[in-house]
Curated annotation (Swiss-Prot):
Catalytic activity: tRNA(Ile) + L-isoleucine + ATP = L-isoleucyl-tRNA(Ile) + AMP + diphosphate
Gene: ileS
Protein's organism: Gluconobacter oxydans (strain 621H)
Gene Ontology CC annotations of this record: cytosol
Biological processes per GO annotation: isoleucyl-tRNA aminoacylation
Co-factor binding comment: Binds 1 zinc ion per subunit.
Record-stated family: Belongs to the class-I aminoacyl-tRNA synthetase family. IleS type 1 subfamily.
PROSITE patterns for this protein: AA_TRNA_LIGASE_I
Cofactor(s) needed for function: Zn(2+)
HAMAP family (alphabetical): Ile_tRNA_synth_type1
Function: Catalyzes the attachment of isoleucine to tRNA(Ile). As IleRS can inadvertently accommodate and process structurally similar amino acids such as valine, to avoid such errors it has two additional distinct tRNA(Ile)-dependent editing activities. One activity is designated as 'pretransfer' editing and involves the hydrolysis of activated Val-AMP. The other activity is designated 'posttransfer' editing and involves deacylation of mischarged Val-tRNA(Ile).
Recorded domain comment: IleRS has two distinct active sites: one for aminoacylation and one for editing. The misactivated valine is translocated from the active site to the editing site, which sterically excludes the correctly activated isoleucine. The single editing site contains two valyl binding pockets, one specific for each substrate (Val-AMP or Val-tRNA(Ile)).
Full protein name: Isoleucine--tRNA ligase
EC code: 6.1.1.5
Binding site for L-isoleucyl-5'-AMP: E606
Amino acid sequence: MTETGSSLMSDKTPDPSVAAFKEQQDRYRDTVFLPRTGFPMRGGLPKREPETLARWAATGLDEKIREAGKGRPVFTLHDGPPYANGHIHIGHALNKVMKDVINRAHRMSGYEVRYLPGWDCHGLPIEWRIEEQYRKAGKDKDQVPLLQFRAECRQYAAQWVQKQAEDFKRIGVQAEWANRYVTMDFSSEAKIVDEIGKFLLNGSLYRGLRPVMWSPVEKTALAEAEIEYHDIDSTTIFVAFPIIKDPTPAHALNGVSAVIWTTTPWTIPANRALAYGPDITYVVLRVDETNENSVVPQGAKLLVAEDRVDAFCTETGITAHHILYTLPGNGLEGAVCAHPLRGRGYEYDVPMLPGDFVTTDAGTGLVHMAPSHGQDDFMLCRQYGIEVPELVQDDGRYAPWVPHLAGIHVFKAADPVCDLLTEARQSAEHDDAPATGLMARGTVRHSYPHSWRSKAPIIFRATPQWFIAMDGETKLREKSLSALDNVTFVPEAARRRLTSMIEQRPDWCISRQRAWGVPIAVFVEKRTGEVLRDAAVMQRIVEAFREKGADIWYEADPSLFLGEGRNPADYEQVFDIVDVWFESGSTHRFDLGQEGLNFPADLYLEGSDQHRGWFQSSLLESVGTMGVAPYKALVTNGFVMDEQGRKMSKSLGNVVAPSDVTESLGADILRLWVLNSDTNEDLRIGQDILKQQGELYRRLRNTLRWLLGALDGFTPEEAVSYADLPPLEQYILHRLTELRGLIASAVETHQWVGVYPALHGFCTTDLSAFYFDIRKDAIYCDAPSDPTRRAARTVLDALHRALCTWLAPVLVFTAEEAWQARFGEDDSVHLAQFFEPEAEWNDPELGNRWEDIRAYRRLITTELETARRDGTIGSSLEASVTLPLSQEEAGIFGGLDWAELLITSHAETELLPGDTAHGGPQVERAPGHKCARCWKVLPEVGENTEHPALCRRCIDVVSA
C-alpha cells in the first residue's frame, strides 16, 4: 500500500499517537496478503543472461523446441549471410533480433520454424585482411602461392564464423547453429558453380568489353553494392572541339567549336564522340569581350545549348557576346568534330550523336563521350560502331601507348591533361583556327563513388568481363519484374525501389579479378573465342567442386574437367572469380526446398541497402535458373545512426557495439530497443536512448514481479468463470483480446512496428496505473475466498501467462525467468504457444463503455489531485466524492462502485434533474477513522472493541 496519512478517531476512542497507530499496523501486518515472490526487482541481466544460455544448452532446449515443432506447418526465414569478418556490429544485431522475434513469434503461433544461419566467406574484405597481415610482415602477396593464400583466407573466415555465432547467441538469437551454411563449404561452392553453369548453358552468360566500376587500389571490378559515396573536390574543365564537318544548309557551323564540360579531365584522351539532345535548342555565339581571367579567345564562335548561355558565359569569363545562329538539336545530325588533342597523337574524328540522356541541367548541353569510361558513353558509341579504346590499366595508370600521359595515374592527370589542352588552344590561336582545347578550368564539390573496403575513389573502366544478360532470349529483366508481382513488401514503398533498380540496371557483371572466391569455372575455345557450353563438362566441374572444393580448379589438369576428346591446349581456362553477390544470391540453392525447408522462402529480411545487393542478386538467380522469386515476402529494416542522426564511425567516437550493451545492460535491453523503434526507418541509438529503454524494461519487469507476487499460492481451483467476473475484470480480459489481435496481425504481415510499445503501454497504463491500483485493496485485504479477490487473481493468472508468452520473442531471458519463477526450471516459456484469450472475452461494446468510464475517471482524479494540493485531503483514501450525473451519464457511469474505481473511502452518485447545470464532482474529507489494516477512512472504524482500529471487512478477515 502506498497511501499514508493521519487517522481520525471517534469520540468514544481517544486520538492515538502516531506511534500507537503504527503499533496497530504492526499488529495486523501479517494478516495483509502482500505480494511474495523470489523474482528479484533488479534484472542483473549481464550476469543472469549467460547463466540462462548455459542452462538452455545443458538441457537441450533448442532440440526440444525442434522436436515440439515437428508435424506443424513450416515457416522458413532464409538468412541473408553476414560477412565473416570481425565481431558483429549494431546493424547485425538489429537485423538478427528482428529475424529472431519473427521466428519465435511464428513458433509460438503454431509453426515449425526452420532457420539456418549463414555466412558469406569469400571476397575482397577477407583478402584485404590477409594482405594487411602480409604487409605488416614485409611479405608480398604475389610471391605467396595462390593455394596457400586461399588457405589462409579460409582459415581467417572460419574463425570469424565461430566468433560471430557466439556473438549472435549472446543476444538471444535462436537458430539451427549446427546446421548452418557458409559459402566456402565444398557443397556450397559446388552449388555456386552449378548456378554459373545454368546461366552458361541457357545462353545468358557471355564475355564482353564494357565499362564497369573499377577499383584501381584493389585492381578489380566492383558491384554497386560494394560502393559508397563521399563528397570530393574535382577539377572541372570546358573544352572546345572544332567542328570539321558542317551538315547545316546555311553553313552555320563553319568555323564553330562545340564546347563540353566534364568533371573527369582524365577521360579526354578516351573521347570518341560528342552527344547532343535532339530536342534541345542550341545557339552559335560569338565572343565579343572577356574578363581578365578568361582564356576564351575573343572572336571565337562556340556552340552551346540556348538554356546554358548565361551560366556558360559566367563560368568562362565571357562578358559580351552575340548570337549568330539558333538551331534545333536534330540539326546537328551529321556534324563531326576533331579531337581537341589532334596533332598530339589523338588523330580521331569525333562525330556528334543524338543522346536522349543529354540535359541542360549543367554544363553546356553537349556531352563528351568516352566509351571506355561511362555506361551511356559505351552504349551510344557501340550503337554507332565506334571503337572502345583501352587506355587505362588495372592500377589506374595510363597504358604505355597513351601519348604524353603514359604511366600517369588518372587521379593525378588533371594538370597534365589541362596542360595539353592549353597547348592545343594556344596553337589554334596562333594559327587563327577555330577555338580548340581548354576554355576554362574550375572545381566542384560533388558526391563520388568509392570502394566501401579501401575507401578509395573508383573509376569506370572498360575491361573484358563476364556478364549475365538482362534482356535477349532469356528475358531475365522482364521475368524478374513479373516475379515481384507475387511478393509482399514491408514496407510497401520498398517495391518501387527494387523494381526501379531492376528496370534500370545494365547486364550483370559477375567477374572479379581476385583470388579468394569461387572461380567462374568455364572454358573458352582459343580459335573462335567462343565459351564452351557443354553440360557434361559442367557436371564434371560441379562434382569435382563438391568433392574437393573450388581449389580443385587451380590444382587439377584441365583434362579432368574437359574429359576425353578435347585437347586442353585448345582452350583458355578462366580464372576470374565470381562476384560475391552472385555467391550469396545462390544461397537459396543451399538448403531451401530440401530438408523440410520451404521454397520459395516465406521471408527474406535485410537492411534497405540489400535492394541493390542480396535481394536483387537472389531474385535474378532464382528467376534465371528456376523461374520464380526465391521469397514470398521481403522485409526491410533501416540503418542505425547515433543519437544525433549521424552515421557511426570510429573517428566520431559514436560507435555502439552490441557487446558493450550486453555487458553493461543486457541483451534484453538491446532487443527491447529494436522492437520499440520504427525499424522501417533509420534508427537511433546511444547512451541516453539505451537509458530510456532500461527504464521501459524496469516498468515491464515490475509488472511481471507484481503479478508473480500477487499470484502467490494461486491454484486452478481458485479461478472464477468468465460469467461470474465483475465488469472490470471482463474489461481487462477484453483488452487482452485486442492485444492478441495486434500480435496475430504482426505475425501475419511481418510488421512489428508499434506492437511492443502497445504492450508496454498496456502494462503501465492499463495495469499498473489502473487495474492493479484498483485491485490492490481486494488482493491485499479481502479474504482468500472473497469473490472479488478470486476474480482478480483469475485475471492476474491470465495476465501472467499472456505477458510471459507475448514478451518472450523479445525479452527472451526475462520472460523465461518470469515463467520459471512460477512454473519451475523444468518448464520453458519458449516451449509454450502464445496465450490465446477465450472467444467470449472479446466484447467491443464493453470495451467502449470502459474507455468512457476511464476517461471520466481521469477527470475525477484530476479533482482529487487538486484537493490533495490544497490540503483538503492527504491521499485519495481520505476522500469522499460525490458525482453528479445527468440522465445520459447515469446510463454509462451509474451502478459502479466509484469508491473502488477512484481508490477513495467513499463515493456516491447524484442524479441531476434534466435542466440542472452540471457542477462537477465534489471532493470532501471522508468521515470516520483510518483502518490500520486497509487504510480506508470509514465511520465504522472503532465500533469493535476487540479490533477498534479495523473496519468491518478487515475484522471479518482477521477473525476468520
